[in-house]
A protein has these predicted regions:
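Intrinsically disordered, low-complexity segments enriched in small/polar residues
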Residues: 1-2, 111
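Short, acidic loop-to-helix structural element flanking the phosphoryl-transfer center
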Residues: 2-32
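Asp-based, Mg2+/Mn2+-dependent phosphohydrolase catalytic module
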Residues: 19, 23, 30-158
Length: 158
């Protein structure tokens, strides 16, 4: 119902270090959110979390017409972003099925965010696994980029 959906997007508690990590990554990468769900709920959550300003693009299944883990979801998002080199893309997520299997279906590297240290009993095989968001930086950034964190003139082009 409408009231329920409007309330869902009002609250969002970002993961520990989310803002700082996104700020660092935004200096060297294009950041896109890919999410199954309802557009206004996901946009509301991003705004409520204070992270929306750090996101370059948002792709939600309601608007995309297909859900993760379908390869078409990722293919469409990459096309809209103008990404030709899939080797420069990393799908990061906490869902082995939607995020990790979905990214793999699209031929993309994946990183499973697993802060609780859960066992992977699925068939999905992440390229990387992290317990803390901060652990993304050395995966995504070259050493020179890690050294340049804080210098916004060093941004990647997709």
């Amino acid at each position: 119902n409408e009231y329920y959906l409007s309330r869902l997007g009002e609250k969002a508690i970002p993961c520990e270090d989310a803002r700082e990590v996104l700020k660092d990554l935004a200096e060297v990468a294009t950041i896109a959110v890919v999410s199954n769900g309802v557009e206004r709920v996901q946009q509301g959550r991003l705004t409520a979390s204070g992270l929306a300003e750090l996101i370059d693009a948002t792709f939600v299944s309601e608007r995309m017409g297909v859900t993760k883990p379908n390869r078409k979801f990722f293919d469409s998002a990459l096309h809209i972003l103008g990404v030709n080199n899939r080797e420069k893309v990393l799908v990061i997520g906490d869902s082995l099925r939607a995020d990790i299997q979905g990214g793999s279906n699209a031929g993309l590297a994946t990183c499973w965010y697993n802060p609780r240290g859960q066992e992977n009993a699925s068939g999905a095989k992440p390229t990387f696994e992290i317990a803390r968001l901060r652990d993304l930086l050395p995966i995504v950034m070259e050493q020179e980029e890690l050294d340049d964190v804080g210098n916004p003139a060093k941004r990647h082009m997709v």
